[in-house]
Amino acid sequence: MDRDEVAALLALPIAGVLLVLASRMVRARAGGLREDRAWARLVLPLAPASAVCALFAGWAFAGPEEAQSLALVNIVLAVPFALVLARAVARAIRSLLSTAAATEPARTAGLIRPAVIIDEAFARSLSEPELRAVVSHEEAHARHRDPLRIWIARLATDLSWPLASSGAEARFVAWARALELARDAEALAHGADPHDLANAILVAAALRSAHAPEPSASAAIANDASFLDERIHRLLDSAPPTVRASSRCLAWTWRAALASLLGVTFTIGLVYGERFLPLLAR
């Protein structure tokens, strides 16, 4: 086998086990989290697995392009984790090709350059202030590149299947709800009237129920009765909903920490990997 193939087969079971353990250690919370903290709880279990992959990538990069031997037991151990990875990637690709989101009354589409799309029938059913409130909410999604973040979150959740899928799914739902509440608050901060936005949310929910018997995952979360009530009550409360915006400093701190972790582990694999990683292949 090539060195990079051996590295991948060795990394898969170790990274997979660490991902499952980390996912089971991070508890899901039903609500009350800020969006940025809910996001951190969702993607944090990926850090140990990513570090392992970086370690083996450094080792593969450092070595010569020559055939490597690998014990049969290593291949057998890698198979179930390879199947989980293949399933997660297949579901991620399918979500990109799915047309379920196209039935949404209002949506933000595009992973790289998100754009706001409003269904014509939905727009006609709203007053001008209500339509502006909807556009303001969707523009908040576009500013934060939420379609890409939702896609990454769904992939991260699927990678925890099947041993830690329930906890990962609960964290995904908690983050998706916190995301909508944060974008509602951002729309109000940009001048949207809470009553107009609440009315538009109810109209959108009615349209989803009537025209999308099999809604997308995001639409199903948005249409959940208990969460819909929570959104409306927050908007119509005497005090405007105040969901703190994500801290740019905190976000960049997380990114820098992850980049440092991956850089350090890659360097360790690059410099010292030949001393101990080949022992795993015997």
Q: Which residues are covered by each model-predicted region?
A:
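Basic, amphipathic juxtamembrane/active-site segments
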Residues: 149-158
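Hydrophobic or amphipathic, alpha-helical segments that drive membrane association/targeting
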Residues: 1-103, 245-282
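Polar-ligand-bearing catalytic/cofactor-coordination segments
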Residues: 26-36, 73-150, 167-245
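Short glycine/proline- and charge-enriched loop/turn segments
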Residues: 159-167
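Short, surface-exposed, polar/charged, turn-prone segments marking secondary-structure boundaries
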Residues: 144-146, 162-163, 263
